Design a protein with these regions (language model features):
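Feature captures the catalytic ectodomains and active-site-proximal regions of enzymes
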Residues: 1-164
Length: 164
């Protein structure tokens, strides 16, 4: 934290983007679902790191905002499609294909999935989503995952941090 404070003291620095991936690490290592995640995040916050970081930034005159790149959802494995290298990206909630034929065949072979055309994606980028609260994991395996389009995965916080 001392080194960060020194780096932020340079008068030419007007904007700083700081990525703290601890919450993501906690989520990806989750064994006890969202309840366990909440407890681990609370324990981490009690370590003082977040308070020290916010105070350092505020003391240096920065406007501080807290956000996330995505949310998470508790899901249960519906099985992993056995496709070798067919999908371009193999996520827990979404698989993407470069071939319409492969995407269509995969959707037909996996009934608990759906396809949706999303504006802004390249024409040869075809996502196949796990439906409901399921994921492309071993059948019945519970996990906290992301990559789908549920409300919990899409809406993220954007909070201004201020002294009170």
């Amino acid at each position: 934290m001392t080194e960060l404070g020194t780096d932020l003291s340079v008068s030419s620095i007007k904007v700083a983007g700081i990525v703290v991936d601890m919450v993501d690490e906690i989520v990806h290592g989750a064994m006890l679902g969202k309840r366990g995640i909440a407890t681990q995040i609370e324990d981490w916050c009690e370590s003082g790191f977040v308070d020290h970081l916010f105070l350092l930034l505020l003391d240096k005159g920065f406007h501080v905002y807290l956000t996330a790149d995505h949310g998470n959802v508790e899901a249960v494995g519906q099985g992993r499609p056995n496709q070798g290298l067919a999908p371009e990206i193999r996520g827990e909630r979404v698989r993407t294909y470069r071939s319409e034929t492969l995407a269509t065949e995969s959707a037909a072979a996996n009934s608990n999935t759906y396809r949706i055309d999303l504006a802004g994606l390249p024409a040869n980028f075809m996502p196949l989503f796990a439906a409901g609260r399921t994921a492309f994991l071993q059948q019945g395996e519970p996990a906290v995952v992301h990559g789908g389009i549920s409300i919990e995965e899409l809406i993220v916080p954007f909070v201004k941090v201020m002294r009170i």
